[in-house]
């Protein structure tokens, strides 16, 4: 068996009435884990670099062995992508690194 998991969007945190939400204007809104497991995987490997969700079809091909001539397989453990990760911020595609980081929310100490 093989299983691939990733969320459709990240979450942001604020001190608003809706404290956990999607925010297309901060990096946390697009930061999601990618988890791959399979019956023939015998070790844990962690990758800390950003991988665009646009590689999903290639990752799926790499994992399953299914091939098409239109999309090359993409191994997220070894294949590098020199293009910046682009995200849609609700208005246009922008580089993910151009978004502001998630602000630190400190607890109210009243």
Stretches found by the model and what they are:
Residues 1-110:
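Catalytic domains that recognize anionic headgroups
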């Amino acid at each position: 068996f093989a299983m691939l998991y990733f969320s459709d969007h990240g979450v942001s945190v604020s001190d608003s009435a809706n404290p956990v939400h999607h925010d297309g204007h901060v990096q946390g809104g697009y930061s999601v884990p990618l988890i791959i497991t399979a019956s023939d995987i015998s070790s844990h490997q962690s990758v800390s670099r950003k991988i665009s969700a646009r590689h999903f079809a290639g990752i799926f091909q790499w994992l399953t062995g299914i091939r098409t001539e239109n999309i090359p397989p993409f191994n997220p453990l070894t294949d590098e992508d020199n293009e910046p990760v682009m995200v849609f911020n609700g208005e246009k595609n922008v580089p993910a690194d151009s978004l502001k980081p998630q602000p630190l929310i400190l607890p109210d100490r009243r």
